[in-house]
Amino acid sequence: SYPAVPQLNAEKKELRLDVDTLVNGINKTIFATADDELRPVMNGIYINLAPDALTFVGTDAHKLVKYEAETENEVTASFILPKKPANLLKSVLLKEDDAIEMAFDSKNALFKLKSHTLVCRLIEGNYPNYNAVIPSNNPNKVLVDRIELVNGIKRVAVCSNPTTNLIRMEIADNRINLAAQDIDFSVSANETISCSYDGQPIEIGFKS
């Protein structure tokens, strides 16, 4: 027989969420989630509800994204939304108008839309203390055109090693220098982007 739809318990919490806020939160964090059988809590988006803010977090222990949106609700709680229903929810939400109704308990979440109702099992466990790894009072601040930076990374990444996808970024003198190379095929790429930078010269490496 077809599986029964999970029922939320009497201690469930309910609220209304703005569609754009939920879609943006999923879009900006889902790419940073993991596929880790040993640490399943990282395989979803951590969502924290507070009276004046809604926080979305995604991490795979190598990269971390935290997205905050202002909101007004009376619920204080948190849960971990699995990646698959998050993607499904995002697709369905694009066809919605303003707000959706949501309810959740310690095991399941229910999203009620105009023509759909999505029920999913939440990931159980304690999410890592992500605030502990976010630097506070960082003296280095850079302001750069996002599209220009993204396009520069895409162009340079073509010449990175396909195994590591490593790109080197040097920031100094109001310039960002992007570099990548694949020694096996004797190819390399460099690109310089203008920026506004306040801080000491730094050099970092990351996966493209």
Map each language-model feature to its residues.
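Structural preference for solvent-exposed beta-strand-turn elements
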Residues: 1-208
